[in-house]
UniProtKB/Swiss-Prot annotation:
This is Phosphate acyltransferase. GO terms for cellular component: cytoplasm. Homodimer. Probably interacts with PlsY. Coiled coil: none annotated. Belongs to the PlsX family. It catalyses: a fatty acyl-[ACP] + phosphate = an acyl phosphate + holo-[ACP]. Keywords: Cytoplasm, Lipid biosynthesis, Lipid metabolism, Phospholipid biosynthesis, Phospholipid metabolism, Transferase. GO terms for molecular function: phosphate:acyl-[acyl carrier protein] acyltransferase activity. The lineage of its organism: Bacteria, Bacillati, Bacillota, Bacilli, Bacillales. HAMAP family: PlsX (MF_00019).
Amino acid sequence: MVKLAIDMMGGDNAPDIVLEAVQKAVEDFKDLEIILFGDEKKYKLNHERIEFRHCSEKIEMEDEPVRAIKRKKDSSMVKMAEAVKSGEADGCVSAGNTGALMSAGLFIVGRIKGVARPALVVTLPTIDGKGFVFLDVGANADAKPEHLLQYAQLGDIYAQKIRGIDNPKISLLNIGTEPAKGNSLTKKSYELLNQDHSLNFVGNIEAKTLMDGDTDVVVTDGYTGNMVLKNLEGTAKSIGKMLKDTIMSSTKNKLAGAILKKDLAEFAKKMDYSEYGGSVLLGLEGTVVKAHGSSNAKAFYSAIRQAKIAGEQNIVQTMKETVGESNE
């Protein structure tokens, strides 16, 4: 049995989409228990495997992250994180304030001893539909080569345990594929990655080939990773708008659009990384999953499923044994 703590109040469409996703999750997974934190006036579910706990406060999207965690002690996000810290829950899921959730993860759930800096990981789509693991996408703007090596180790575990990939191929994001390319960070990181024979390091990868499906894990610093992620999001939205404008521009195009409607919907689904679940803060004493702030019920359900798999696979213990101090 896996038990998850869930923030009912976080996100643009909460609590309705959270309640819908939670209801579907407990119906689909008979080995799942949920502790739901939020406003009792908005709680509508009744299920033997859902425990509800009232919280008098909510962390807003515009709240300053660290201040909110410290001051809003009775918020749904803080109480959710405390349930993971105490061992009452195996992991947690929230679509709320990203900075606040990362702060809750670091200051409440706690970092695994031996992990220098936790990393935010997301699974992004590829042309062939299999996707790739990408980290760090914003937990740490600055990084040292040693941090990127640990990110690779964490990403390797994630790809194996969560995505079911044996001996995942690991690449370093760079401005060229040659070993000597890049700045001091990428050059030194390349050396460290190449020396770690526990990893299947296949070399550098350029941003233009990220979605080709040639690798399973891509490692970079949080500043670069966040920019790449937002660029991909923006590009996908722009392409979608351009396609829509083109289809609606003439009767001929409208007819073609009607014929291709199903195919276009499938294409949009393949490009939507929320299909793979949320982003995960790796390197903590518990699983912390961040669903997209604008998640619908389906995307939040995927994030719940992702946290459940992490609990089943005991990913935190594996990280402790492989990357943490217990490995030393």
